[in-house]
């Protein structure tokens, strides 16, 4: 083969690079004082390491999950004093704040013209709920024929250390059953075996769940010794039509992480949900900064759950909104806009005097119509 001067030049250049590398390979080995198993290159070998092209690296703020924390879970109520009495007397919540708000900023935030709201925050353990009564305008009740597989279904899961005592407390206070009674999930279901659960309803027909984890399941804090019957809120659950579509919203855009999965069916699950033939794909998600989880309930069967009403408003009693704290509301709003998710608010809305504990917020619907309130403190 005939070598051109250019070819010879490239060969000489290659030899000049390979020679020091060969020497470096012969002299490699852990240096005295270096960590065990970590190989430190001699200086001559470092000098000839190939240069790596500059790659763009996202800043810490850009790469951080959009949602920092699940702050609380909100629901609309018809009679605030009645709801406060129910949640405090029956379930041991404590009132933290009680405020009335009105004005154009809140109208734009909530998507309801002419509103006046009474908003009460109540805590149970480390977690909180936010109850909102619309003094004006009044909204519609929960549909009387609602079922647990309809896609406007949402509940909070309240943890107890003693299901029998918890059920007795609920019966003494004549709560409305949504399950036939407490259910213990079967041993064959590895991810849910031994969990005890019961669905019931508050005075406005909101679904609630009381839940007891067996040893080895659930957050460690639910197993600490306590003299309290009700300990806190583990998660809020929502019915979804398609888990993968919901993951694109909650995981891929909002940055929540999958914490667990399960597929539940059988007579215990049917009587818990009070849906014959219920077979559920369950996916639990968590925010990096803590707070209650968000749990998807996808009914693989039956598939006759109804979609959420398209004209649902925040003043309706079947309205829930889960409050999510974000670090950069504008960045999240832009991402949601480009992916065509449905806004309740016209965009990020600044609210006066941080009356509800945040400076700006927006309401957005997930693929099934569940509302998330994104707030920037």
What are these regions (language model features)?
Residues 1-9:
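Bacterial N-terminal signal peptides that target proteins for export
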Residues 8-19:
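Bacterial N-terminal signal peptides
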Residues 25-65, 68-78, 118-131, 136, 142-231, 238, ...:
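Vicinal oxygen chelate
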Residues 20-24:
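Sec/Tat signal peptide C-region and signal peptidase I cleavage site
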Residues 81, 85-101, 136-137, 146-152, ...:
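Extended intrinsically disordered, low-complexity coil regions enriched in Ser, Thr, Gly, Ala
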Residues 76-127, 172, 188-192, 239-293, ...:
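Core segments of cupin and vicinal oxygen chelate
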Residues 139-140, 206, 304-306, 370:
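Short, charged/polar, Gly/Pro-enriched secondary-structure boundary elements
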């Amino acid at each position: 083969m005939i070598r051109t001067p250019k070819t010879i030049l490239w060969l000489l250049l290659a030899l000049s690079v390979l020679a020091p590398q060969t020497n470096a390979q012969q002299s490699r080995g852990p240096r005295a004082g270096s960590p065990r198993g970590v190989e430190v290159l001699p200086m001559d070998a470092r000098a000839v390491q190939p240069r790596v092209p500059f790659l763009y690296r996202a800043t810490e703020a850009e790469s951080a999950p959009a949602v920092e924390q699940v702050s609380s879970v909100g629901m609309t109520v018809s009679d605030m004093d009645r709801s406060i009495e129910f949640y405090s007397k029956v379930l041991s919540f404590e009132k933290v704040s009680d405020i009335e708000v009105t004005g154009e900023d809140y109208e734009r935030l909530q998507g309801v013209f002419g509103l006046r709201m009474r908003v009460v925050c109540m805590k149970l353990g480390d977690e909180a709920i936010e109850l909102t009564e619309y003094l004006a305008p009044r909204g519609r009740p929960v549909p009387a024929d609602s079922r647990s597989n309809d896609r406007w279904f949402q509940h909070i899961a309240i943890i107890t250390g003693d299901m029998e005592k918890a059920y007795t407390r609920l019966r003494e206070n004549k709560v409305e059953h949504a399950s036939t009674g407490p259910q213990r999930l079967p041993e064959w279901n590895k991810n849910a075996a031994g969990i005890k659960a019961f669905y019931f309803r508050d005075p406005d027909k909101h679904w609630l769940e009381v839940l007891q984890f067996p040893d080895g399941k659930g957050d460690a804090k639910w197993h600490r010794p306590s003299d309290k019957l009700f300990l806190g809120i583990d998660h809020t659950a929502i019915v979804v039509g398609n888990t993968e579509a919901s993951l694109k919203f909650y995981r891929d855009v909002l940055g929540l992480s999958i914490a667990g999965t399960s597929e539940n069916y059988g007579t215990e699950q049917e009587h818990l949900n009070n849906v014959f033939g219920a077979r559920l794909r369950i996916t639990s998600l968590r925010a990096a900064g803590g707070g209650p989880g968000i749990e998807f309930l996808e009914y693989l069967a039956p598939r006759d759950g109804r979609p959420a009403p398209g004209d649902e408003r925040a003043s309706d009693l079947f309205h829930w909104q889960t409050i999510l704290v974000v670090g950069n509301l504008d960045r999240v709003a832009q991402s949601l806009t480009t992916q065509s998710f449905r806004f309740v608010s016209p965009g990020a809305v600044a609210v006066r005097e941080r009356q509800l504990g945040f400076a700006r917020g927006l309401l957005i619907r997930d693929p099934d119509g569940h509302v998330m309130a994104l707030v920037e403190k």
